[in-house]
A protein has these predicted regions:
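Conserved ABC ATPase "signature" region
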Residues: 103-119
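Hydrophobic anchor residue at the start of the ABC signature
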Residues: 136
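Conserved ABC ATPase signature
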Residues: 122-129
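Conserved ABC transporter NBD signature motif
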Residues: 56-67, 71-72
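Catalytic Walker B motif of ABC-type/P-loop ATPase nucleotide-binding domains
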Residues: 147-151
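Helix-to-loop junction immediately C-terminal to a conserved catalytic motif
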Residues: 48
Length: 222
């Protein structure tokens, strides 16, 4: 189980996260929706250990990553919105870096993301969509129990987008927890839980209220 309690964060005098809380159980997929600049990416960076919060607590599978930073590495996979890859390195070398060792990634992972023939290719030679695939593969290379994804289907063609969503269902079927941001209606409606971020405050949308009109109303500044 994942428990996020009262996470806060400020940049200077601007508070961008205001006592954000959520929880997730094994096999759940959670989506967070909101306007650009509302705090979604900041929250995901904190949950992935890429940024420290000003306050609050995290509990991942009974461990506290804010007290023991190695928990982030053991428990989390992170796919940021921006390209996290090192362009001057090959696909294989990037995957080895993300896997924290020099072993080759397993074949099933390479087949899933269709990277078998690209391992020696420099990332700088790849298209935006292919870079996204490599980023996704890097995010799951350590087989994390908690997968954090910032708009994971951005830059993917419609066919591969569907393949990724089918893969996520299998991941959830193995008790994996997915937390992702999205602007896509289908992804919002398919999730187990939906939250809206507005000006640093996180609102949970009840299943009976989950429709695009309600979600759009929540995103509007009061």
């Amino acid at each position: 189980m994942i428990e996020v309690s009262n996470i806060s964060k400020s940049y200077g005098k601007k508070q961008v996260l205001k006592n954000v809380s959520l929880d997730a159980r094994a096999g759940e997929r959670i989506v967070i929706v909101g306007r650009n600049g509302c705090g979604k990416t900041t929250l995901l960076k904190i949950l992935a250990g890429a940024m420290a919060p000003d306050g609050g607590s995290l509990n991942y599978f009974g461990e506290e990553p804010l007290k023991d930073k190695t928990v982030f590495r053991r428990s989390c996979g992170y796919v940021p919105q921006e390209n996290p890859l090192m362009d001057e390195l090959s696909v294989l070398d990037n995957m080895r870096l993300w896997g924290y060792d020099r072993r080759n990634p397993d074949r099933a992972l390479l087949e899933q993301f269709e990277l078998e023939k690209l391992l020696k290719t420099k990332v700088s030679k790849l298209s935006g969509g292919m870079k996204r695939r490599v980023s996704l593969a890097c995010g799951v290379i350590s087989h994390p129990g908690f997968l954090i994804m910032d708009e994971p289907t951005a830059a993917l063609d419609i066919c591969y987008r569907d393949e990724l969503l089918q893969w996520l269902k299998k991941y959830q079927g193995n008790s994996g927890i997915v937390l992702m941001t999205t602007h896509e209606e289908a992804e919002i409606m398919e999730a187990d839980k939906c939250y809206v971020m507005r000006a640093g405050i996180l609102f949970k949308i009840d299943d009976g209220q989950r429709n695009m009109k309600t979600i759009l109303d929540y995103t509007k500044e009061s």
